[in-house]
């Protein structure tokens, strides 16, 4: 099995595990986050879109949703999944967030990928800048649809990660960077 194939599966799984930066202290009930992720693997650059929708159902709980598709070469992958983001901390700050989400990547010719992510982050504020710093764990399962020497029939794994997010307000939008 190609090491490059395993890297692509792990990178795709980490891409699916991205959590939206929903400010627990914001008054908004609906959040829409759009962006792009890129990774450089063995001299190949991969770009993936990110679309996250969040609905704040209570002061300390949001429902997350990822449902979108895109064109990549001659394939049309679909991203389908949901999760919960829970905020806790002192009554006035809610400066911690815990996220659990399950996301599936379907529609590719050779494989499909399922991802379960658990993420814990702390919010920090510096003037109008917002930061999140935390840890997470991503559990994934890849299934190959056709017999190929490049991908295993089934690949399972876990990736632990450190997360850092940054955003700054720009009129009615927030401009940010996530890893």
How would you describe each model-predicted region?
Residues 1-91:
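Transmembrane beta-barrel domains of Gram-negative outer membranes and organellar outer membranes
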Residues 36, 49, 65, 78, ...:
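Polar/charged side chains located within well-ordered beta-strands of beta-rich proteins
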Residues 29-31, 59-65, 91-96, 128-131, ...:
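Repeated loop/turn-to-beta-strand initiation elements of outer-membrane beta-barrel proteins
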Residues 57-58, 81, 92-97, 112-114, ...:
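A general secondary-structure boundary signal
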Residues 32-38, 65-69, 82, 98-102, ...:
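Transmembrane beta-barrel strands of outer-membrane/channel proteins
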Residues 1-23, 41-43, 108-176:
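Outer-membrane beta-barrel transmembrane domain signature
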Residues 37-41, 68-74, 87, 91, ...:
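Sequence/structural signature of outer-membrane beta-barrel proteins
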Residues 55-59, 86-88, 122-124, 166-170, ...:
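Residue-level signature of outer-membrane beta-barrel architecture
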